[in-house]
Amino acid sequence: MVDVLRFYLCLLCRFLHALTVTFLSDIFVWLVAKTRSIQAVIILHVASIERAYSNHQVNWSYIFQSAISKAIRG
């Protein structure tokens, strides 16, 4: 019984984490699009795909910093 509860709790935590990351990334993309340019959004999208495929996980802080610095540099 405890293992079943632990399994469902773990599933719930993973779902909430994925939902939070998706929501925060959407807000970030919107802010970049409003403040700088659509080019930064494209860079962010490409960087996230590259990082996801190379590491099989997404390092969001690296992606955000990379997109911001590339958008500022032009």
UniProtKB/Swiss-Prot annotation:
The chain crosses the membrane at residues 15-32. It is found in: Membrane. It is a single-pass membrane protein. It comes from Saccharomyces cerevisiae (strain ATCC 204508 / S288c). Keywords: Membrane, Transmembrane, Transmembrane helix. This is Putative uncharacterized protein YBR109W-A. Its main location: membrane. One of its GO terms (cellular component) is membrane. It comes from the Eukaryota. The keyword Membrane applies.
